[in-house]
Amino acid sequence: MSYKNYYTWKYPDIPEHVAPLLLELQNSLVIVGIIGRSKCAQANKMSAFGMQPDKTHEPADGQILCYYKPGTNMLLLHFETTHDEAVLGQQLLKQTSVDFDSFYEQMRSRFLRMLLLALHVCHILVYVETAQTFDTTLVTICQLLKYVREKHVLDFLPQMLRETAAGSLLSDRARLCTPRVLFLFENYPQDEEKSRERISAYEFQTEDKIYELLRQYNIVTNNANNSLFALPNNKQFVFYNAHEKLRPDQLLLAIEALNATMYKSDSKEEEEDTEILELAPFEGFVKPYGAGYEARESDEQLYRKKHTVWHFLQRHVQDALQGCFDEGSFKQLPQSAQFQLLGVNDWHICMDTIHRLLIGNIQEVSYVTNNQNYKAYLRDFNESLNYEKKFWGHLCDLGLKKGISAYKSSAPAIYGSVTHRQLLADAILAFEEEGRGPYAELALAKLSEICLRHWHDGRQQCEQLSLRGNPCTQPKDAPHDKHSSGIVHISSCNCGRTQGRREDPFTLRQANYDYYEHMAAMCNLCVKVKKFQLPVFTPSISDYRAAAFEAAFPLLLQAAKNRTEIATGGDSDLEAAGELYSQPINATEQAPQKPQITLSNGCSQPALSATYGSDLNMSIAGFGASLNEGEEVRSPEISSQIASSGLSSRSNSTSSGTSSANTANELVLQLKERTDQNAANAAVSEICPEALPIVASTEQVSTTEYLPGLVHMSSGCELLPLFPSWSLACVGPSSIYSHNTGLQEHFQSGFLSGANFLLPWDVHVRLVQPHKHPQQQQQSMGKKSQRYRKHGDRLALKIFVGFEYECSRGHRFMMCSPDRVLRGGADIERDTSSKVVNNNMPLYFPCPCRAQPTYLAQLMRIHVVTPKAPVNIILDPKMCVGKYTFTLGCPTLPRLSQSAYWILRLPYVYQGDNVLITPPERLEPDDNMASGCLLAGMFGIAETDTNETNQQAITPLTFTRL
């Protein structure tokens, strides 16, 4: 023991020189347990008792230190638990995961096992608290301990103790007694007065709070045997260390010891200091206080001397030794309870047995027992203590049920992924009303899985996207002939007279052909109109197919070639791409190759002629050249025609300087001689006058492979589509349109008020006859030609055009400029068609039927009323959408007959090289052409051969683009 007045050792070894001292106590040994919190490095909670471990001591979880002071009947057990900061720090260093909840539950379980052991082997238990107030979490710990003891420990511990030597020493309650619990607060509030009355009042106040909490949660009851622990009656069980500094600064202690050593007692003053002492206010000034002053403070000093934790503990130890330990417990009537004092050997036997059953066997994974209750204790101890886990799990279960119910109650019979995501979001919101905590993430994953399984259980929607981006609403598992999105649009037929309901198309054929064929069967006008026959694929074999990758999609092929040239590896990537996208094709079925030519820019405006006024802003460049944009020159004859057109334009330009002012706004047409070949073509025109080509096509087209998609300027002319996506029809004579009344409802239905007018277009044309012998010229001219000649060669043409837009609700309207809807009235009187003819027109424009600018209408029809004159209007529409410029795909462009009402219906859906071009959700505010536009310069004019009045001209004349 050396300079210490106590002994300390680690359980279970008892030093040989201490064992005889403990044996002398026989059956009067009181076991006092010290447990709780500490902040020092050695996890020491014995500082208030004036005890401390060896300097070489290393704290550890579950370690028990024994303290014994000779001359006392107490054996103090110091329990090192995870409530000690030093032990908790060690566990943190060993922790590998970052799950705080699991770590906290693990630390609490370890502390509960040590506290459970202390309640079974101790008579008195001192709970040490480093804070200044009571920690209410101890109430929760006591509740868990009571649950574990009543539900698990009492089921196996008494039975298993009876099988050992400790069974005869302990009662059926399997412990020495109902232990008395005391509370030691190492720190007193600094703002409280350290007087006897104030300290006692503060201790009593804390006792009342603790007692109320323990009674409220049934930790202590009137029956001592059924209580987890006991509280003394009429005795203090809360102690505040208000005077002693438990862990003083060692440096300050050394300084105080030095001052005490250097202090010397009072001596007689020297005579030379007498004069100085006379200046003192009283005798003994600047000297230590005498014994009289200390005597006056004896009462306070006596209280400080007796107010120690040792004296506080001794009062309860004496109760245990005198046999009145449980008398009057719980502040109720006196009652008898079992209480046993054992010798050190007997206690050691009980301690070993209980420690092994409650703690030791849990740490041994290989331990096997036949006791089912004990087996359940070993297996479920941690789970039974994790009430937070049960609480959070219960909340998550409630939230899960609520979320599943919300999902299933709102789910329709068949729904798609968008609806599923919305329903799942609503289910998650319903879950979050109840479910929360660390297990919420797992519960949400389970909720998503259950909802997904419910959706896939015969409720999944097909969700095949339509060409307008709407999913199919048919069941995915159930067989269905065709897709249907459930969305219905109102659309007009080819001629525009009849409107019908069209389902959302899923194929290009449904969008651009089948619907209009269906409407043509119901429209009285469509069956009567004259249609221009657009070139389509005519198979020569039964197993015809879509064109190969290289022929059908030249743009994709060119991109693949460019990538191959840059990357290493040669042609392997290109060959792989061809195998992936193309079908096998025989050598005999390959399309004929065309020589590469340079394509002209479809967006460029034609050049202006000096013979034509700038106010009309029209070009008189040779239209023959424009007819062959993107195509190779087919014959020397056509080349000569184009050349002659250019020459005539230049000759007319040189002579225009001497012309009069009346010829300033004239369009010059150079007439050519009629040849035998022209006469033959004229004979052909009698057979098919309504669909007359300008120049016969000499290029070979494929009869085994068709073009999958719309024709554009980069697609080969040897491939034709299966069906026409455009429609050009003559709906009647020009007299059916009146500029005073506009388009009537019985003729063109669905037009908005004021937007049902065509715009006038005045064109002045001067015909230039070829030089002939007068007699030959007289023979070649008919009566009508002589009549025109009689009235002069100048013609004033009145053309009416209209660019019609149609929305999905069936509303139709005309545009008077690229950015303005025709409003009628002043717009008709003021505006002409020059703004729409000479400018690019947007493919999409906001419909005025809705206030939202996102509700778009699409350019669907071009209305043309041709004049009654010996000229024909030529159509060459070019729709620029994205990187594609779509055309009619005709090798020869259509010629509109005179004095007739023609309607060109545009495609409903545009598809490029295997790429569907969907309508935009909204237009760009700064550029409404970004989503597509109809290029300017789609109209041309050609002179009609007047030798045959009952025929349309088929001779290759000089053409001029308007």
Swiss-Prot record:
Domain of life where this protein originates: Eukaryota
Pfam families given for it?
Smg8_Smg9
Write out the ranges of the annotated region (Disordered): 634-661
Determine if Signal is one of this entry's keywords.
no
List, in alphabetical order, the GO biological process terms annotated in this UniProt record: nuclear-transcribed mRNA catabolic process, nonsense-mediated decay
Q: Which residues lie in Low complexity bias regions?
A: 639-661
- State the family it belongs to: Belongs to the SMG8 family.
Q: What does this protein do?
A: Involved in nonsense-mediated decay (NMD) of mRNAs containing premature stop codons. Probable component of kinase complex containing nonC and recruited to stalled ribosomes.
Q: What is this protein called?
A: Nonsense-mediated mRNA decay factor SMG8
Q: What is the lineage of its organism?
A: Eukaryota, Metazoa, Ecdysozoa, Arthropoda, Hexapoda
